[in-house]
Amino acid sequence: MTSPKPIRTRFAPSPTGFLHLGGARTALFSWAFARHHKGVFVLRIEDTDVERSTDAAVQAILDSMDWLGMQPDEGPFYQMKRLDRYSEVLQSMLAAGTAYHCYSSPEEVEAMREAARARGDKPRYDGTWRPEPGKTLPAIPEGRKPVIRFKNPQDGVTAWDDMVKGPVSFDNNELDDLIIARPDGTPTYNFCVVVDDWDMGMTHVIRGDDHVNNTPRQINILKALGADVPQYGHVPMILGPDGQKLSKRHGAVNVMEYDDQGYLPEAMVNYLARLGWSHGDAELFSREEFVRWFDTHHLSKSPSQWDPKKLNWVNAHYIKAMDNAELAQRVAPRIAKRGGDASRADLADIMGLFKDRAETLEQLADDAMLFCAPFQAAPQELATQHLTPAAREALAGFAAAAAGTEWTREAISALIKAQLAERGLKMPQLAIPLRVAVTGRAQTPAVDAVLVLLGKDVVLERLKALL
């Protein structure tokens, strides 16, 4: 009895731009499927569009994959390094009669399509150069370089059981004889994909449903080569909050922009996973749980809707749950970028003070500057509003009593309560002036916690300077 064939999946982006959210989600599903089945996840860079492909886009794809924790088991492989292999397969297909040279000019092909439209038929190449038994082909036009077309079956049906959509079928007579090599000999996208999937032993292909129309053509080429046909799954697109196709007008679509904006990769993986896949009513789960639970049966057949508020909620959960020391390591570079002191020994404590109300690391870094940036006194308007003569008198009393007080949250809280009772004040009448006096802000976390982290000497020094 032979052992089952190991699962092999792939992600095959074109480096003509940065990795967008839809591509990242497709990669995530392919990666999780391979991990779930203890298979192999392959990264392939489809860079045959030489004019539009850039090294910067390749690096952005690699950086995005690394940030999301989707390291490939094999690759990256580059199509431009496989041109000799494509040429070899093209020649074998010409020799086998499954491909042929076509000398029709683009203008002639367009005329064929127009004629088909006029007849009410589907616009297509009419097979002028398609060799058939007993058929006489036209004379080869002088000086014209041919394309190579695949000799697609003209009858029957090409069908597959899609892992997401279910049964899908196309009548072969609806499929054109696809161009698989251009006049200069360079192979086309659909041909390269087929050869790559064949050579790399792909067993399952999960990709966007914009590829559905390519699939019957690719299946027929694979069959002509005598290759195994992978199982295909086509996931619906991601829509913006307005129900339109997700685009830049909805905000960031480049994955690494979310890193810049302070989203955790763990949160992004969680959110992307739930965008078109579900496991019961579970909203929050670890990467390990996602891999353990993932299966294609629970991929949605309907488009998903991008919800920035939901992403913020997920990110806030991961920030709250993260160890303060780990959080400090992740936020430190953002503090340094703002010119703050990211080397403070109490940075983890600062994270603990702010993280329960932070939705992003950027917000957390902004909050942390309260302690990590040089002190700036309150703006005049804020000082006028809150540092009244009565408030200054209360602050002077607090400062005098604080000089001999142990500097803990409990002791400071008790001191504030004692001052309130002694002066007949309510909490805001002392707490807000204290905040404004020692932080320059009217709103901060709990005032006793802020005072502890600032340190007794700093607090008394700032009060002395004010009074």
Curated annotation (Swiss-Prot):
It is found in: Cytoplasm. ATP binds at residue 248. This is Glutamate--tRNA ligase. It comes from the Bacteria. InterPro entries: aa-tRNA-synth_I_cd-bd, aa-tRNA-synth_I_codon-bd_sub2, aa-tRNA-synth_I_CS, aa_tRNA-synth_I_cd-bd_sf, Glu-tRNA-ligase_bac/mito, Glu/Gln-tRNA-synth, Glu/Gln-tRNA-synth_Ib_cat-dom, GluQ/Sye. It is an enzyme of class 6 (ligase). Catalyzes the attachment of glutamate to tRNA(Glu) in a two-step reaction: glutamate is first activated by ATP to form Glu-AMP and then transferred to the acceptor end of tRNA(Glu). GO terms for biological process: glutamyl-tRNA aminoacylation. Its main location: cytoplasm. One of its GO terms (cellular component) is cytosol. Belongs to the class-I aminoacyl-tRNA synthetase family. Glutamate--tRNA ligase type 1 subfamily. GO terms for molecular function: ATP binding; glutamate-tRNA ligase activity; tRNA binding; zinc ion binding. Keywords: Aminoacyl-tRNA synthetase, ATP-binding, Cytoplasm, Ligase, Nucleotide-binding, Protein biosynthesis. PROSITE patterns: AA_TRNA_LIGASE_I (PS00178). It catalyses: tRNA(Glu) + L-glutamate + ATP = L-glutamyl-tRNA(Glu) + AMP + diphosphate. Residues 118-141 are annotated as: Disordered. It comes from Bordetella avium (strain 197N). A motif ('HIGH' region) lies at residues 13-23. Residues 118-133 have a biased composition (Basic and acidic residues). A motif ('KMSKS' region) lies at residues 245-249. Monomer. The keyword Cytoplasm applies. Its EC number is 6.1.1.17.
